[in-house]
């Protein structure tokens, strides 16, 4: 089922997600709905808070990046078909020299900004089988992981840009909060909850 994506300004996007257990209600359905919602919105990642759930789950599928001819062939190959569910994730290390990439977010439509992140990340997480694993990722896969991980920590990519850039996008952010934006995917907005 395609779920509405929560827009900027909703308090759920600022909550630190709660860890879950294997008996979390409708877990498989929740994850399937998250993937379906992400694909419907042409995203490469989606975190549970973005569908209104303050829990520690995010899903990614970097396949759309694999067509980028500006990337080295080996990275294109890594990106193609990389699909993963991260449950109760914890980034244990970020390393390397920060690099900039123009990021966007399904919860913040029509806003894109350059964000600096480290190129390599070590992360502990469970997949749907709840077996804990530790893996190292780099490049765009690491970046997507860091972006989605931020969501389960209550952090948005707009928190990582300069105060000048924040001022320049303030009107857009206010419009999103008030639901004054149009997307081809379903969204719900903080102002609508207040009787707007």
Curated annotation (Swiss-Prot):
Disulfide bonds: none annotated. It catalyses: N-terminal N-formyl-L-methionyl-[peptide] + H2O = N-terminal L-methionyl-[peptide] + formate. Binds 1 Fe(2+) ion. Signal peptide: none annotated. GO terms for molecular function: metal ion binding; peptide deformylase activity. GO terms for biological process: co-translational protein modification; translation. The active site is at residue 148. Its cofactor is Fe(2+). Its EC number is 3.5.1.88. It comes from the Bacteria. The keyword Nucleus does not apply. Fe cation binds at residues 105, 147, 151. InterPro entries: Peptide_deformylase, Peptide_deformylase_sf. Keywords: Hydrolase, Iron, Metal-binding, Protein biosynthesis. Gene3D superfamilies: Peptide deformylase. Belongs to the polypeptide deformylase family. Removes the formyl group from the N-terminal Met of newly synthesized proteins. Requires at least a dipeptide for an efficient rate of reaction. N-terminal L-methionine is a prerequisite for activity but the enzyme has broad specificity at other positions. This is Peptide deformylase. It comes from Flavobacterium johnsoniae (strain ATCC 17061 / DSM 2064 / JCM 8514 / BCRC 14874 / CCUG 350202 / NBRC 14942 / NCIMB 11054 / UW101) (Cytophaga johnsonae). The gene is def.
């Amino acid at each position: 089922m395609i779920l509405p994506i929560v827009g900027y300004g909703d308090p759920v996007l600022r909550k630190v997600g709660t860890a879950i257990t294997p008996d979390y209600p409708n877990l498989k359905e929740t994850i399937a709905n998250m993937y379906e919602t992400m694909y419907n919105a042409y995203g490469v990642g989606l975190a549970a808070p973005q569908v209104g759930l303050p829990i520690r789950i995010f899903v990614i599928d970097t396949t759309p990046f694999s067509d980028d001819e500006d990337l080295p062939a080996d990275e294109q190959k890594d990106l193609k078909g990389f699909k993963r569910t991260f449950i109760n994730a914890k980034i244990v290390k970020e390393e390397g020299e920060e690099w900039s990439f123009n990021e966007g977010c399904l919860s913040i439509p029509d806003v894109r900004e350059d964000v600096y992140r480290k190129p390599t990340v070590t992360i502990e997480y469970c997949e749907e089988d709840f077996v804990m694993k530790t893996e190292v990722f780099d490049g765009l896969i690491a970046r997507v992981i860091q972006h989605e991980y931020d969501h389960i920590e209550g952090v948005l990519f707009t928190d990582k840009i300069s105060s000048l850039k924040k001022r320049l996008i303030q009107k857009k952010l206010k419009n999103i909060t008030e639901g004054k934006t149009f997307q081809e995917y379903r969204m719900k907005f903080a102002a609508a909850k207040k009787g707007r």
